[in-house]
Amino acid sequence: NREQFGRSLTGFQLIQEKLARMEANTVTGLGLSDRLATLQAAGEFAEVPASVAKMQNARLLRETTALGREICGGNGITVEHKVAKFFGDAEAIYSYEGTHEVNSLIIGRHLTGKGAFV
């Protein structure tokens, strides 16, 4: 319920655009996760779909929390507001969830038939 210039932040176009992107990221991530769960339930779990979901969902989480932090302005970086903790958690997940780079190499090997691991 934060206000700026006597108006609710949710009434500003750029805030609504950020909220829309956050929603799209959430729906996309859930769709990837659902597809992966469906494959696993059918006994068709494979490394590449898992890497796609991990890489993309970690990236989407990182972007979504950054957008939330932007919406909160200066409050988005203070410990009194949870968005700063979420942002830190998202950075950790982006790094430890197999790392974006490693998952991209797994996907790249699948697409090209050539391993680029060094």
For every predicted segment, state its role.
Residues 1-118:
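Alpha-helical interface subdomain recognition
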